[in-house]
Amino acid sequence: MQLPSSTKILVVGGGPAGSTAATLLAREGFEVTLVEKAIFPRYHIGESLLISVQPIIDLLGAREAVEAHGFQRKKGVLWEWGGERWLFDWKKLRYDYTFHVKREEFDEILLRNAQKNGVKVFEGIDISRLEFDGERPVAAKWSKSSTGESGTIQFEFLLDASGRAGLMATQYLRSRMFMKAFQNVATWGYWKGATIPEVEVEGPITVGSIPYGWIWGIPLRDQTMSVGLVIHQELFKEKRATQSVEEIYHEGLKASPLFQDVVLKGATLEPQIRTETDYSYISRTLAGPGFFLVGDSGAFIDPLLSSGVHLAMHSALLAAASVKSIIAGEVDMASATEFYQRCYQGHFLRWALIVASFYEVNARKETYFWTAQQLAHEELGVFNMSQADMKDVFATMVSGVVDLGDAQNAGRLQKGAERVHQYLDDDGREEDVTALLQKSKQRIFEYLDRVKNRDSRAAMQRYKAGGTETFSMGLDADGAVGGLYVTTEPRLGLLRKVVEERAEAATEAPAPAAPPPAVAEV
């Protein structure tokens, strides 16, 4: 199949963000072309999925293929953190499990699913340059190294899912902002014969802190375990002056009794050890005229809570719904891009707050690693958000994780967010962002204490009956941003909250009197 000279929608990148957005838009009847630099399957880190991806797997129609592949099921999380042990499980949620995956296999399933849904997929294609009409990208220069072919493809909409390479953010917008917090380095390898700790849940990811970092253990389906060490970049550089990467890795593992004496006892390390920087960043511009940055192209957050694929697939859903409604004339370009920008910023900030709060549990150890992870007031400037939007993030983040542990409907969610707003701003005036941040963290610490004390209602994340995160933005009427939110039924797109409110009012109004019986004509 020849790469076309033009397409309605061009998606750059075939990872979960690109394949999700492409599939959703192709199913709406649009011409979608996806180009990917690599040839799939290709290796990628980020193997532990959150439950929040499960509804999107269903939405994509990929459930059967994912289940049939036999990925290791993940029904919880085991933490040894700050000298304490916590076990999270999801027994009472709509989806009580998710997966640990080999990303080369999972990502290919999603990409082939995109092809089945009508997406034109081209692998081994490198995009070297974009052409613009004003601020709007309209064409891409491409080449295929395996054949020497090259050309130009024109498009109306660009979804940049190019990952950390960040086609738009790094080459044209130059808008990528790195956070001072979470500037870490990950080193990992794969072990045969590792032991999953014996706990009450199946296949948990195991996370353990050490004095100067933390370790993950992700069980994969072929009796292999991914085990990684995360330390601050400055310490990594310091150690590299006298130690090899392998020595740094093994020294870190030995600092954790959980991994040294339980998980890796009797296990064998495969030869290759990999290293990658985990610098967290977000683009100041995430959408604009005719373009959207999705997944890692727009933002990347510290891997502590395994949020990478979650952010990729959720941002893809937000972007696909926005593009569909623009094309259909349901929402204007400016409103849709503002909606996407604010939603993705909000999703990212919530994860940053939660990660910072977990790191702060260990801050009392007063090592450079733990103090370096703290999200300070000036750090929040990276998000380029209004104080009102930031306050909404704090309120809904805290209410979703803590205050509404038993929430099962949108009404309770809304009331919970209102209660937290009152808590954060109980004197009726705008507070300092630092104070809001600290109060949000305080509530998370209270939540962690509940988990530690085995409160039966406590869980790592709470989901509504529909399976969506309780603290998501833009994914239901109660999370509307700028009056807009995503709908997938009966068709994908953006709805205005006011429309739904009017519909509800009409439903609640007294029914009109029945008309008199018709009189038959004779």
From Swiss-Prot:
The entry's keywords: Chloride, FAD, Flavoprotein, Monooxygenase, Nucleotide-binding, Oxidoreductase
Protein name: Tryptophan 2-halogenase
Disulfide bond entries: none
PANTHER family referenced in this protein's UniProt entry, alphabetically: FAD-BINDING DOMAIN-CONTAINING PROTEIN, FAD-BINDING PROTEIN
Enzyme class at the top of the EC tree: oxidoreductase
SUPFAM superfamilies found in the cross-reference section: FAD/NAD(P)-binding domain
Other notes: Chondramides are secondary metabolites with antifungal and cytotoxic activity. They are non-ribosomally produced depsipeptides consisting of a polyketide chain and 3 amino acids (alanine, N-methyltryptophan and beta-tyrosine or alpha-methoxy-beta-tyrosine).
Family note: Belongs to the flavin-dependent halogenase family.
Pfam families: Trp_halogenase
Function recorded in the entry: Involved in the incorporation of a chlorinated tryptophan residue into halogenated forms of the secondary metabolites called chondramides.
